[in-house]
Amino acid sequence: MKPAVEGIMYPIGAKAELSSSLPPVSGHRFEGPYMEVPHAAWSRCKSVLDKAFYFETDPNVAQVFVLAPLHKGTVCLDETNAVYAPEDGELAGSDWKISLQTPPVIAGLISFSDDICSEESSLEIIAPYLSVRFPNARVCWLLATPESRNVKRIVEIIVKDFPFSPIFISNNMETGCAAMWKEALRP
């Protein structure tokens, strides 16, 4: 996938900026089961993102999950309950890249569409952070509407099969548009 909002929602050269401004961290651990991150332009939320990514990371983390709302809607009526993910590959900006991969164990519950996913910016806004903190990890980015029926089942599989993988919920703090993911992660 190609970046769609580089230079608009975050700066060109974002990884270089983060590498020099985001300090190496020790002693602060990722506190699960998930971390909530905003999806807004860096001009509005960079200090919140800096705090959200202020934790020590394990370079051996193999999988990261980013769960986000689908704002644009679905392609056709029979997919109104779908959860979407981009095709496996990579998302790359001017000086960063992340590997996109949906684990096979949940692939059957998801519709794949680069077109739909490229209209959402929730992953791209935090991708430079992910490239700094989890340089070797595969990222599974899932988009859903509040009506998506597979959200609960997908979360159950993620929690069971990937207990040590960081989970980020991209949420607008004012509208709570990712509430379905938060609800599914409640014990």
Label the predicted regions:
Residues 1-187:
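Active-site histidine-anchored catalytic micro-motif
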